[in-house]
Each structure stands twice: as C-alpha cells, then as structure tokens.
Amino acid sequence: MKNQDQALIFEVSKEGRIGYSLPKLDVEEVKLEDVFESDYIRVEDAELPEVSELDIMRHYTALSNRNHGVDSGFYPLGSCTMKYNPKINESVARFAGFANIHPLQDEETVQGAMELMYDLQEHLIEITGMDTVTLQPAAGAHGEWTGLMLIRAYHEANGDFNRTKVIVPDSAHGTNPASATVAGFETITVKSNEHGLVDLEDLKRVVNEETAALMLTNPNTLGLFEENILEMAEIVHNAGGKLYYDGANLNAVLSQARPGDMGFDVVHLNLHKTFTGPHGGGGPGSGPVGVKADLIPYLPKPILEKTENGYHFNYDRPEAIGRVKPFYGNFGINVRAYTYIRSMGPDGLRAVTEYAVLNANYMMRRLAPFYDLPFDRHCKHEFVLSGRRQKKLGVRTLDIAKRLLDFGYHPPTIYFPLNVEECIMIEPTETESKETLDGFIDKMIQIAKEVEENPEVVQEAPHTTVIKRLDETMAARKPVLRYAKPAPVQV
C-alpha cells in the first residue's frame, strides 16, 4: 500500500468540485478592474486542480508517507550530520514569546529574545575559541561567503589588494571553492597526501604573497583529523594569510578541541546540523560566523551587544561589510540550537563527540572486510569506503546506493569527496543505537555478497520503490516543469 502509485493532484481534479466554503460576502464587492490594470488581470482562469478537502488530505498524506527523514529511519548521509532533533527544541521554539514576535518590534519589547541570542553567541564563542560571533548568516555556505568577505575586507583595509587567492584541499566541500569564487577570489587546490591529510610540502608550494586564506574542515571530509594543523596555521600566517574553518564537521570535536586553539581566524558553524536545528528540504538553516579580534571591525552590521541598560543592536560600524541578511539571522533555528546546548551542557556535548566517533569507527571496522578502505586508520565522526572492488564486478557505487532503498535506508553520500574513486561516505552520528547500526551494516554486507553472487539484483535496483531509476539526462536537458492538460479524446 505504501508504495502504490499516486496520481498527480491535477489528475484527481474534477470540474466543478469544491473543497472549501466561504461565508457570504459582508463588505462591498470590488471589481478587479478597479484595482489592477488590465495587463495584470487574467483573460482565462488558471488551470488549477478542483478537488475536495478529502481528496487533498489523502493525496498529500500519501505523498508524505514516501518521505524519508531522521524521524522515520537511519540517515547516514556523510558530511551532513543527520542526527535526531530533540522535540524539546520544538516546544521551546513555539513559546509565544519567541514564536509571536516580529523583527521590526522595538528592542525594548523583545529583550528576552535578544538575551537568548546574546547568550547563544557567548556559548558559541566558548565552543569555538573565537573572540566574538555574529548570528546573521542564514546557512553554511552563506556563512562561508560571509567569512571570506570579512577576510577580504581585512586585507583591503591593510592595503593588501594583491591577496586574491584562496587555497582549498582536494577533499574540500564543494561549497568552499564556490563561496570563494562568489566572494571574488581565485581558488587554488592543495593536494592530499597518501594518508588523506593536507600535503604540507604542497601547501608550502602554493602559499605565497597572493594568498588570502586557506579554507579547511577539521576533521576533513574523509573523516580524518588534520594532525599537522598547528604547522599549517603557521605556514599560512607567516605568509600573511588567514585560516578559515568550515564548521561542517564540528560534531567530531565538541568540547574536545576548539578551532580557535588550532590557529583558525574565522569559523562558520551549521546550527542546523551540529546543534539539531532540523535541516534538509531547503532549510531553514543558521550559519553563525566567529572571528578573532582583528576581524571584529568588519563583521556585518548590526552586532548584538549587552550594556547596563539591556541588549541592543549596534549599527555604528563604519568598517563593516554591511548586512548579509535582513534582520538578524534565522531566529527560530537559533532558539533550537540554544535549547540543545543548554540541555546538553559541556559534558553532554563531549559525549556527543565520543559517541559519534565510536559509532563511525565501529561501522568502519565491520564494513572494511567487504569494501575497500582507502585510509585504514582511526576516523573521527565519519568515514569513507570505496566501491572499487564492486566496480570491477560490474556494479557501481550508484547501484549500491539504489539497492539500499529496497531495505528502507537513505543511502550514504556517494562520489564525494572527489579524490576517492567510487566513494561511499558514511556518517552515523551519535544518536543512533548499535542495533540500528548493525541493521544497516548487515544490509551493506548482504549487498556486497549480492554483487559477487547475483550482481543483476544490485544493478537493477531499486525494486520496491514507486519510481525506479530516473532518466537523469532527460531530466536535466528536457525537464517537465508544469502540468500539461491532456487534449480531449476525439470520439
């Protein structure tokens, strides 16, 4: 029943069917022609579906049952930290004093909300080892861009206009070079060594007087801790550059290590990942940016300050890069992150990292006999396998991911990072039980055996979903973006 094909809402439509009722008009009727110019008025009615309320409920309930989320099943998407979002976060975010306020209210009327944001900033400062934090950026890549614009403003304020290049590792998130480009920089790639870490000799080769910054994730996207980070920071700083921390993998070091202590000058965080704001489906997110003291003058305005008279926004910042978002960040996600931090406490956050790392290493060791392990060493919160041996038997990593759908699992991240052939990146997070991990591992082992004994089963997967495999080429080149009403049948 769950996977039964579902008609489009347009196909359910019957002319004249009504799904609502409105009270009799009790004000003077106004004609559209009296309000809008003729150019803005439809000549023909829009072809909208005509359905009953029951039709609507059944249609969208059926579609929702096809969705997969953290609340419905294991979601081991590497580098995405798809952890469970505690429902206490939702309860607090729905407090009337948070849910019913408006960003244009006078500061005096929202002191409680401002206190929460200020306290959240203080917690993030302590967690990251930065000197201050802005909550304004809306999401991770937005935080990246904001941080890079701060670095650019810093160099330009010091008359250093030739620093036009940002260095990123070959294992970097795709958003890193993209954010650098949008911020006006040229990206330079630094290679990884045979251990999956940044090659120090190659870093020394590419760093020069044109280097604005080095962007790093630590641990990196392979799930490996950059153990030479202090030396890397020294190399970049001695050349006059800044060190940027992509906080995508902060879940691996909470309350155990701080970017600020590693030598990073700028850090962005993903509150919707590490600190359990719900994410996926396009947002919302929250990407606060923390900086060291020499970058504070350039933070986007306003900044939230505390005085003896309460909390207020300071707009008097002549060197600021300007606003990066209307108002002051995605407040609802910030409430959820604050609730999470306060409910967990320092010991709880430390346990988050301990269990995230334990889960990842447990899975890696159980799966290593059945898939190639490019870097056979202790990992942090996530790890990378390779489907090279399966590819030799005619089965691609994509096929393995499709086969997992038959067992009700969301596939891991595949083909990323780009420097691992047939890459399978798995991040279990700390919130999953051993029983859940074992269930997924058993299916991965089953798939590996199917590749050897009956590869067609994997090559033709999925078998149990409504949609099997999309024609991705046609979807990209000739997408169907609107419903076309069938022509009347000629009798």
Swiss-Prot record:
Q: Which GO terms describe its cellular component?
A: cytosol; glycine cleavage complex
Is Protein biosynthesis among the key words of this record? Answer: no
Tell me a Gene Ontology molecular-function term this record carries.
glycine binding
Which GO BP terms sit in this record?
glycine decarboxylation via glycine cleavage system
Give residues where N6-(pyridoxal phosphate)lysine occurs. K273
Q: Which UniProt keywords apply?
A: Oxidoreductase, Pyridoxal phosphate
Q: Does the keyword Ligase apply?
A: no
Q: Which cofactor does it need?
A: pyridoxal 5'-phosphate
Q: Which reaction does it catalyse?
A: N(6)-[(R)-lipoyl]-L-lysyl-[glycine-cleavage complex H protein] + glycine + H(+) = N(6)-[(R)-S(8)-aminomethyldihydrolipoyl]-L-lysyl-[glycine-cleavage complex H protein] + CO2
**EC number from the UniProt entry:** 1.4.4.2
One Pfam family from the UniProt entry? Answer: GcvP2_C
According to its UniProt entry, what is the function of this protein?
A: The glycine cleavage system catalyzes the degradation of glycine. The P protein binds the alpha-amino group of glycine through its pyridoxal phosphate cofactor; CO(2) is released and the remaining methylamine moiety is then transferred to the lipoamide cofactor of the H protein.
Subunit structure, as described in the record: The glycine cleavage system is composed of four proteins: P, T, L and H. In this organism, the P 'protein' is a heterodimer of two subunits.
Family the UniProt entry places it in: Belongs to the GcvP family. C-terminal subunit subfamily.
**HAMAP family attached here?**
GcvPB (MF_00713)
Q: What is this protein called?
A: Probable glycine dehydrogenase (decarboxylating) subunit 2
* Gene it is expressed from: gcvPB
